[in-house]
Amino acid sequence: MKEIWTKALAEYHGKFVNFEPTWCGPKPAQAGGPPVLMGAQSKWVPQRVAEYCDGWFPVDAGDDLAGSIEAIRSEVARHGRSKDVLDFSVLMTEQLAPGGRLEARIQDLIKLGFNRVLFLVSAARPDEQLPVLDRYAALIRKFV
């Protein structure tokens, strides 16, 4: 994708992806294209982020996120890349922080190094979704 995002006429021949000269537009507004985030949770994430990605985007499901972030930073440094420019985003829902702990959990995630929290809104009727969006909006105002 980065070839396509950054070159007027892109061509790439790799192990898994192979394409002849091609053009694609419009190009992303952000120079170099948007960051590529690894959206997975496995033992291979640190190596794959270090080799291919600009950051990590897990679901906050009670896993050892602190350990994973440290492993990613270590692997990125081992590959000679700056660990200070990584993008750590996380996806969460109200159900993952029960008992009114959502604000505290967001604070915990920020302390771990996440720079973006995205909220999942379950598929439902608008009259069920709007109260959830209102709660998220009120919460977001506390952090901006």
Where are the model-predicted features located?
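Active-site-adjacent structural elements that line small-molecule/cofactor binding pockets in enzymes
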Residues: 1-144
